[in-house]
């Protein structure tokens, strides 16, 4: 199974810069409880990246991938005969048929309690904050009418239980 992460930079005007896209492909050796951390260095404290995640190269007929951030989550199941799942953002609250692009950036706010600290300490605390996106990938059990009927008629060895 492959986990592809595509980061598209967004400039200060809000425009995507497709010529500076970063592509990362991860092929986890052990799929059980694998934790992967990507650190992205930005060229500016105002830089942002649009995130696209593709899960492909799996053997199962159906998989479900759940993407969780601090405030949102979404689960995606691949269609039949399709061997990839694509995450491009979370569901838009006012229109569930579209997604909002998932954008990350290094510009974070700092609590007022740290106002008496040195500038270097404040900058370090801003740079050390992380955007967490958790991805859970499992085999999905998808049942349609034919599979349910087949389960009633045939046993596990594909022998008919009606013709004994």
Curated annotation (Swiss-Prot):
One of its GO terms (cellular component) is host cell cytoplasm. It is found in: Host cytoplasm. Its main location: host cell. Keywords: Early protein, Host cytoplasm. It holds the Pfam family AcMNPV_Orf17. It comes from the Viruses. InterPro entries: AcMNPV_Da18. This protein is required for viral late gene expression. This is Early 18.5 kDa protein. The lineage of its organism: Viruses, Viruses incertae sedis, Naldaviricetes, Lefavirales, Baculoviridae. The gene is DA18.
